[in-house]
Amino acid sequence: MELIKPQQKVVSPEYLLFEAPRTKAFITGSEAASEAVKRANVDIAIAYPITPQSETMQRVGDLFGQGYIRDYYRAEDEVGAFSAISGASRTGVRCMTASSGPGLMRGIEVIASWPGHRVPLVFLIMCRVINAPLSIQPDNQELDYMISSGNIVFHAENHQDFFDWTLAGFIISEKCEVTLPVAVAVDGFFVTHARGWVEMPSSDLKLPMRDCYREAVPMIDNENPPIRIARDAPIQKSNFISYQMHASWQQEIHAAQERSRRWISKYLNGLVEVVNPGAEIMIVASGSAVSQSREALLQAEAMGHRIGLVKIKSLRPFPVEELREACKNAKRIIVPEFNCSGWLNREIRATLYNHSQAEITPGPRVFGGITMPTELILQWIFQDAEYCR
Protein backbone atom coordinates (compact mmCIF):
# COMPACT_ATOMS: atom_id res chain seq x y z
CA MET A 1 0.00 0.00 0.00
CA GLU A 2 1.39 3.41 -0.96
CA LEU A 3 2.18 5.77 1.90
CA ILE A 4 -0.04 8.85 2.02
CA LYS A 5 2.32 11.72 2.78
CA PRO A 6 1.14 14.39 5.22
CA GLN A 7 -0.01 17.65 3.68
CA GLN A 8 2.03 20.57 5.01
CA LYS A 9 1.90 24.19 3.91
CA VAL A 10 5.22 25.86 3.11
CA VAL A 11 5.59 29.15 5.00
CA SER A 12 8.42 31.62 5.49
CA PRO A 13 10.91 31.07 8.33
CA GLU A 14 9.75 34.34 9.89
CA TYR A 15 6.13 33.22 9.92
CA LEU A 16 6.93 29.78 11.32
CA LEU A 17 9.19 31.06 14.11
CA PHE A 18 7.58 34.37 15.05
CA GLU A 19 4.07 34.81 13.67
CA ALA A 20 2.27 31.46 13.49
CA PRO A 21 -0.15 30.70 16.37
CA ARG A 22 1.32 28.27 18.88
CA THR A 23 -0.07 25.68 21.25
CA LYS A 24 1.62 24.41 24.41
CA ALA A 25 2.64 20.79 24.92
CA PHE A 26 4.28 19.12 27.93
CA ILE A 27 6.92 16.98 26.23
CA THR A 28 10.48 15.68 26.60
CA GLY A 29 13.46 17.33 24.97
CA SER A 30 13.73 14.38 22.58
CA GLU A 31 10.14 14.98 21.50
CA ALA A 32 10.81 18.71 21.14
CA ALA A 33 13.71 18.03 18.77
CA SER A 34 11.69 15.60 16.65
CA GLU A 35 8.78 18.06 16.52
CA ALA A 36 11.19 20.66 15.13
CA VAL A 37 12.43 18.21 12.51
CA LYS A 38 8.80 17.49 11.55
CA ARG A 39 8.39 21.15 10.58
CA ALA A 40 11.84 21.59 9.01
CA ASN A 41 11.20 19.99 5.59
CA VAL A 42 14.18 17.67 6.05
CA ASP A 43 15.26 15.53 3.10
CA ILE A 44 17.49 13.01 4.86
CA ALA A 45 18.50 12.09 8.41
CA ILE A 46 21.34 9.69 9.20
CA ALA A 47 22.64 8.70 12.64
CA TYR A 48 24.05 5.94 14.79
CA PRO A 49 22.30 5.38 18.15
CA ILE A 50 23.91 6.38 21.45
CA THR A 51 22.35 7.32 24.78
CA PRO A 52 20.86 9.92 25.34
CA GLN A 53 20.52 10.71 21.62
CA SER A 54 18.83 7.43 20.66
CA GLU A 55 15.24 8.39 21.49
CA THR A 56 15.40 11.52 19.36
CA MET A 57 16.62 9.69 16.27
CA GLN A 58 14.12 6.89 16.87
CA ARG A 59 11.39 9.53 16.74
CA VAL A 60 12.95 11.03 13.62
CA GLY A 61 12.78 7.53 12.11
CA ASP A 62 9.07 7.49 12.93
CA LEU A 63 8.74 10.77 11.02
CA PHE A 64 10.29 9.04 8.01
CA GLY A 65 7.72 6.27 8.32
CA GLN A 66 4.95 8.88 8.42
CA GLY A 67 6.28 10.65 5.32
CA TYR A 68 7.65 13.82 6.92
CA ILE A 69 11.24 12.99 5.89
CA ARG A 70 12.23 11.76 2.44
CA ASP A 71 15.01 9.38 3.50
CA TYR A 72 16.44 7.97 6.73
CA TYR A 73 18.77 5.21 7.79
CA ARG A 74 20.94 4.03 10.65
CA ALA A 75 24.61 4.11 9.76
CA GLU A 76 27.21 1.49 10.69
CA ASP A 77 28.91 3.86 13.16
CA GLU A 78 29.44 7.57 13.82
CA VAL A 79 32.21 7.96 11.24
CA GLY A 80 29.90 6.44 8.65
CA ALA A 81 26.94 8.58 9.72
CA PHE A 82 28.85 11.87 9.67
CA SER A 83 30.58 11.06 6.38
CA ALA A 84 27.31 10.07 4.72
CA ILE A 85 25.43 13.15 5.92
CA SER A 86 28.25 15.32 4.57
CA GLY A 87 27.95 13.65 1.19
CA ALA A 88 24.18 14.06 1.25
CA SER A 89 24.52 17.77 1.97
CA ARG A 90 26.83 18.17 -1.02
CA THR A 91 24.01 17.02 -3.29
CA GLY A 92 21.91 20.02 -2.25
CA VAL A 93 19.38 18.45 0.10
CA ARG A 94 18.48 19.43 3.68
CA CYS A 95 20.25 17.15 6.17
CA MET A 96 20.45 16.46 9.88
CA THR A 97 22.24 14.07 12.20
CA ALA A 98 22.80 13.73 15.95
CA SER A 99 25.11 12.21 18.55
CA SER A 100 26.31 12.31 22.15
CA GLY A 101 29.59 12.24 24.11
CA PRO A 102 31.77 9.31 22.99
CA GLY A 103 29.89 9.05 19.69
CA LEU A 104 30.69 12.65 18.89
CA MET A 105 34.33 12.08 19.83
CA ARG A 106 34.53 9.05 17.56
CA GLY A 107 33.40 11.12 14.60
CA ILE A 108 35.23 14.37 15.43
CA GLU A 109 37.57 14.00 12.44
CA VAL A 110 34.61 14.12 10.08
CA ILE A 111 32.79 16.80 12.09
CA ALA A 112 35.83 19.07 11.84
CA SER A 113 35.88 18.61 8.06
CA TRP A 114 32.31 19.86 7.55
CA PRO A 115 33.04 23.60 7.85
CA GLY A 116 36.01 23.48 5.48
CA HIS A 117 33.87 21.79 2.85
CA ARG A 118 31.10 24.35 3.58
CA VAL A 119 28.31 21.80 3.96
CA PRO A 120 25.08 23.17 5.46
CA LEU A 121 23.43 20.77 7.91
CA VAL A 122 22.10 20.61 11.47
CA PHE A 123 23.88 18.49 14.07
CA LEU A 124 21.94 17.84 17.28
CA ILE A 125 24.14 17.14 20.31
CA MET A 126 22.69 15.57 23.46
CA CYS A 127 25.64 16.08 25.79
CA ARG A 128 26.92 13.26 28.00
CA VAL A 129 30.06 12.17 29.82
CA ILE A 130 33.11 11.31 27.72
CA ASN A 131 34.66 7.97 28.78
CA ALA A 132 36.44 6.77 30.85
CA PRO A 133 35.12 5.60 33.21
CA LEU A 134 31.97 4.65 31.36
CA SER A 135 28.97 6.83 32.15
CA ILE A 136 25.86 7.85 30.25
CA GLN A 137 25.12 10.80 32.52
CA PRO A 138 24.91 14.49 31.48
CA ASP A 139 28.13 16.47 31.17
CA ASN A 140 29.00 18.84 28.32
CA GLN A 141 32.75 18.29 28.02
CA GLU A 142 32.40 17.46 24.31
CA LEU A 143 31.50 21.08 23.60
CA ASP A 144 35.11 21.98 24.42
CA TYR A 145 36.03 20.14 21.23
CA MET A 146 33.11 21.47 19.19
CA ILE A 147 33.92 25.14 19.74
CA SER A 148 37.29 24.62 18.04
CA SER A 149 35.91 22.64 15.09
CA GLY A 150 34.73 25.49 12.87
CA ASN A 151 31.05 24.64 13.33
CA ILE A 152 28.50 27.19 14.49
CA VAL A 153 27.48 26.02 17.98
CA PHE A 154 24.36 26.87 20.02
CA HIS A 155 23.90 25.66 23.62
CA ALA A 156 20.20 25.39 24.48
CA GLU A 157 18.92 25.90 28.01
CA ASN A 158 15.61 24.06 27.84
CA HIS A 159 13.00 22.31 25.72
CA GLN A 160 11.72 25.52 24.11
CA ASP A 161 15.21 26.51 23.03
CA PHE A 162 15.84 23.05 21.62
CA PHE A 163 12.70 23.26 19.48
CA ASP A 164 13.16 26.83 18.25
CA TRP A 165 16.92 26.71 17.74
CA THR A 166 16.78 23.46 15.77
CA LEU A 167 14.46 25.13 13.27
CA ALA A 168 16.60 28.28 13.28
CA GLY A 169 19.69 26.14 12.72
CA PHE A 170 18.48 24.97 9.31
CA ILE A 171 17.70 28.54 8.25
CA ILE A 172 21.03 30.00 9.40
CA SER A 173 23.12 27.10 8.09
CA GLU A 174 21.79 27.53 4.55
CA LYS A 175 22.21 31.31 4.26
CA CYS A 176 24.48 32.10 1.31
CA GLU A 177 26.92 34.18 3.37
CA VAL A 178 27.07 31.45 6.04
CA THR A 179 26.96 27.98 4.40
CA LEU A 180 28.26 26.24 7.50
CA PRO A 181 26.99 23.37 9.68
CA VAL A 182 25.08 24.40 12.81
CA ALA A 183 25.34 22.29 15.98
CA VAL A 184 22.49 22.67 18.47
CA ALA A 185 23.54 21.22 21.83
CA VAL A 186 21.49 20.44 24.90
CA ASP A 187 22.49 18.80 28.17
CA GLY A 188 21.44 15.15 28.08
CA PHE A 189 18.78 13.75 30.42
CA PHE A 190 18.27 17.11 32.17
CA VAL A 191 16.43 18.14 29.01
CA THR A 192 16.24 15.14 26.65
CA HIS A 193 14.44 12.81 29.06
CA ALA A 194 12.69 15.33 31.30
CA ARG A 195 9.42 16.99 30.38
CA GLY A 196 8.88 20.70 29.92
CA TRP A 197 6.44 23.09 28.30
CA VAL A 198 7.04 23.85 24.63
CA GLU A 199 5.00 26.24 22.49
CA MET A 200 4.86 25.00 18.89
CA PRO A 201 3.22 26.14 15.66
CA SER A 202 0.94 23.70 13.87
CA SER A 203 2.59 20.61 12.37
CA ASP A 204 0.68 21.43 9.17
CA LEU A 205 3.34 24.09 8.51
CA LYS A 206 6.91 23.61 7.31
CA LEU A 207 9.96 25.54 6.17
CA PRO A 208 10.67 26.15 2.48
CA MET A 209 13.00 23.61 0.89
CA ARG A 210 16.73 24.25 0.80
CA ASP A 211 17.77 26.55 -2.04
CA CYS A 212 21.08 24.90 -2.92
CA TYR A 213 21.74 27.27 -5.82
CA ARG A 214 22.13 30.24 -3.46
CA GLU A 215 25.02 29.03 -1.31
CA ALA A 216 28.75 29.71 -1.09
CA VAL A 217 29.79 26.37 -2.59
CA PRO A 218 27.82 24.80 -5.46
CA MET A 219 26.16 21.46 -5.01
CA ILE A 220 27.19 18.33 -6.89
CA ASP A 221 25.82 18.14 -10.42
CA ASN A 222 27.10 17.05 -13.84
CA GLU A 223 29.33 20.11 -14.15
CA ASN A 224 30.84 20.21 -10.66
CA PRO A 225 33.35 17.72 -9.23
CA PRO A 226 31.88 15.69 -6.37
CA ILE A 227 33.79 17.34 -3.54
CA ARG A 228 35.43 20.68 -3.00
CA ILE A 229 38.90 19.27 -2.42
CA ALA A 230 38.82 17.65 -5.87
CA ARG A 231 38.59 21.13 -7.40
CA ASP A 232 41.44 22.42 -5.22
CA ALA A 233 43.94 19.57 -5.48
CA PRO A 234 47.07 21.72 -4.89
CA ILE A 235 46.15 21.91 -1.22
CA GLN A 236 47.41 18.35 -0.86
CA LYS A 237 50.94 19.36 -1.90
CA SER A 238 53.72 20.46 0.46
CA ASN A 239 54.49 23.90 -0.88
CA PHE A 240 53.72 27.54 -0.18
CA ILE A 241 50.62 27.44 -2.37
CA SER A 242 49.11 24.67 -0.24
CA TYR A 243 50.00 26.51 2.98
CA GLN A 244 48.32 29.65 1.72
CA MET A 245 45.25 27.75 0.54
CA HIS A 246 44.82 26.04 3.89
CA ALA A 247 45.20 29.33 5.74
CA SER A 248 42.66 31.02 3.47
CA TRP A 249 40.14 28.23 4.10
CA GLN A 250 40.52 28.71 7.85
CA GLN A 251 40.00 32.45 7.45
CA GLU A 252 36.99 31.75 5.26
CA ILE A 253 35.36 29.63 7.99
CA HIS A 254 35.99 32.32 10.61
CA ALA A 255 34.60 35.02 8.31
CA ALA A 256 31.47 32.95 7.63
CA GLN A 257 30.93 32.52 11.38
CA GLU A 258 31.22 36.27 11.82
CA ARG A 259 28.68 36.85 9.04
CA SER A 260 26.26 34.50 10.80
CA ARG A 261 25.94 36.89 13.76
CA ARG A 262 23.15 38.97 12.23
CA TRP A 263 21.11 35.88 11.40
CA ILE A 264 21.63 34.41 14.87
CA SER A 265 20.57 37.73 16.39
CA LYS A 266 17.44 37.65 14.24
CA TYR A 267 16.34 34.06 14.69
CA LEU A 268 17.56 33.47 18.29
CA ASN A 269 16.61 36.97 19.45
CA GLY A 270 20.22 37.85 20.20
CA LEU A 271 23.36 35.90 21.05
CA VAL A 272 22.76 36.48 24.77
CA GLU A 273 19.94 37.13 27.22
CA VAL A 274 20.64 39.50 30.11
CA VAL A 275 18.71 39.52 33.39
CA ASN A 276 19.21 42.46 35.78
CA PRO A 277 21.68 44.38 33.60
CA GLY A 278 24.13 46.56 35.50
CA ALA A 279 24.30 44.31 38.57
CA GLU A 280 27.64 44.21 40.39
CA ILE A 281 27.53 40.42 40.70
CA MET A 282 26.86 38.60 37.42
CA ILE A 283 26.34 34.92 36.67
CA VAL A 284 27.43 33.95 33.15
CA ALA A 285 26.29 30.50 31.99
CA SER A 286 25.03 28.39 29.10
CA GLY A 287 22.82 25.31 28.79
CA SER A 288 21.22 23.75 31.87
CA ALA A 289 23.46 25.83 34.15
CA VAL A 290 21.31 28.80 33.12
CA SER A 291 18.16 27.19 34.53
CA GLN A 292 19.86 26.50 37.85
CA SER A 293 21.27 30.03 37.88
CA ARG A 294 17.79 31.51 37.38
CA GLU A 295 16.61 29.75 40.52
CA ALA A 296 19.68 30.86 42.47
CA LEU A 297 19.04 34.42 41.31
CA LEU A 298 15.47 34.31 42.63
CA GLN A 299 16.64 32.95 45.97
CA ALA A 300 19.28 35.68 46.22
CA GLU A 301 16.65 38.33 45.46
CA ALA A 302 14.47 36.92 48.24
CA MET A 303 17.40 37.56 50.58
CA GLY A 304 17.65 41.15 49.36
CA HIS A 305 20.48 40.82 46.83
CA ARG A 306 20.36 41.93 43.20
CA ILE A 307 22.26 39.43 41.05
CA GLY A 308 22.57 39.60 37.27
CA LEU A 309 22.55 36.76 34.75
CA VAL A 310 23.97 36.48 31.23
CA LYS A 311 22.69 33.52 29.23
CA ILE A 312 25.13 32.62 26.45
CA LYS A 313 23.11 31.27 23.53
CA SER A 314 25.80 31.03 20.86
CA LEU A 315 29.20 29.53 21.68
CA ARG A 316 30.42 29.97 18.11
CA PRO A 317 30.39 32.71 17.12
CA PHE A 318 30.98 33.85 20.69
CA PRO A 319 29.10 37.00 21.83
CA VAL A 320 32.19 39.10 22.52
CA GLU A 321 30.73 42.61 22.40
CA GLU A 322 27.47 41.56 24.04
CA LEU A 323 29.31 39.99 26.99
CA ARG A 324 31.56 43.00 27.45
CA GLU A 325 28.56 45.31 27.50
CA ALA A 326 26.60 43.09 29.91
CA CYS A 327 29.50 42.86 32.38
CA LYS A 328 30.79 46.44 32.19
CA ASN A 329 29.60 47.26 35.74
CA ALA A 330 30.34 43.86 37.28
CA LYS A 331 32.70 43.51 40.21
CA ARG A 332 32.37 39.72 40.44
CA ILE A 333 31.46 37.17 37.77
CA ILE A 334 30.39 33.59 38.59
CA VAL A 335 30.69 30.92 35.88
CA PRO A 336 28.76 27.70 36.75
CA GLU A 337 29.44 24.79 34.38
CA PHE A 338 28.59 21.11 33.85
CA ASN A 339 32.10 20.00 32.83
CA CYS A 340 35.54 19.47 34.35
CA SER A 341 37.71 21.66 32.11
CA GLY A 342 35.87 24.95 32.48
CA TRP A 343 35.77 25.80 28.78
CA LEU A 344 33.19 28.57 29.26
CA ASN A 345 35.27 30.18 32.02
CA ARG A 346 38.20 30.18 29.60
CA GLU A 347 36.13 31.87 26.90
CA ILE A 348 34.86 34.52 29.31
CA ARG A 349 38.33 35.33 30.65
CA ALA A 350 39.70 35.71 27.13
CA THR A 351 36.77 37.92 26.12
CA LEU A 352 36.92 40.22 29.15
CA TYR A 353 40.71 40.51 29.35
CA ASN A 354 41.54 44.25 29.43
CA HIS A 355 37.81 45.01 29.20
CA SER A 356 36.69 44.37 32.78
CA GLN A 357 38.11 44.74 36.28
CA ALA A 358 35.72 42.11 37.64
CA GLU A 359 36.93 39.15 39.67
CA ILE A 360 36.03 36.08 37.60
CA THR A 361 35.22 33.03 39.72
CA PRO A 362 35.74 29.76 37.78
CA GLY A 363 32.83 27.81 39.17
CA PRO A 364 30.93 26.12 40.61
CA ARG A 365 31.76 23.25 38.31
CA VAL A 366 30.11 19.82 38.47
CA PHE A 367 30.59 16.89 36.11
CA GLY A 368 30.15 13.16 35.63
CA GLY A 369 26.37 13.48 35.77
CA ILE A 370 25.96 15.18 39.14
CA THR A 371 23.33 17.89 39.53
CA MET A 372 24.06 21.50 40.48
CA PRO A 373 21.97 22.55 43.52
CA THR A 374 21.09 26.24 43.67
CA GLU A 375 22.63 26.30 47.15
CA LEU A 376 26.00 25.51 45.58
CA ILE A 377 25.70 28.50 43.23
CA LEU A 378 24.75 30.74 46.17
CA GLN A 379 27.76 29.55 48.14
CA TRP A 380 30.03 30.57 45.29
CA ILE A 381 28.24 33.91 44.90
CA PHE A 382 28.59 34.85 48.55
CA GLN A 383 31.83 32.91 49.15
CA ASP A 384 30.35 31.53 52.34
CA ALA A 385 29.14 27.95 52.79
CA GLU A 386 27.00 28.96 55.77
CA TYR A 387 25.40 32.00 54.14
CA CYS A 388 22.57 30.28 52.30
CA ARG A 389 21.66 27.66 54.87
Q: What do these predicted ranges mean?
A:
Residues 28-32, 258-281, 294, 298:
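Glycine-/acidic-rich phosphate or pyrophosphate-binding loops and their flanking alpha/beta elements
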Residues 153-214, 332, 338, 375-389:
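Structural signature of the thiamine diphosphate
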Residues 293-326:
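Generic long, charged, amphipathic alpha-helical segments
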Residues 336-389:
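Peripheral docking tails and interdomain loops at the edges
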Residues 3, 181-273:
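Conformationally flexible catalytic loops at phosphate/diphosphate-handling active centers
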Residues 1-145, 150-151, 167, 187, ...:
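Thiamine diphosphate
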Residues 134-136, 252-269, 284-292, 312-319:
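A general structural motif
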Residues 54, 103-106, 128-132, 161-162, ...:
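Short gly/pro/ser/thr-enriched loop/turn and capping motifs at secondary-structure boundaries
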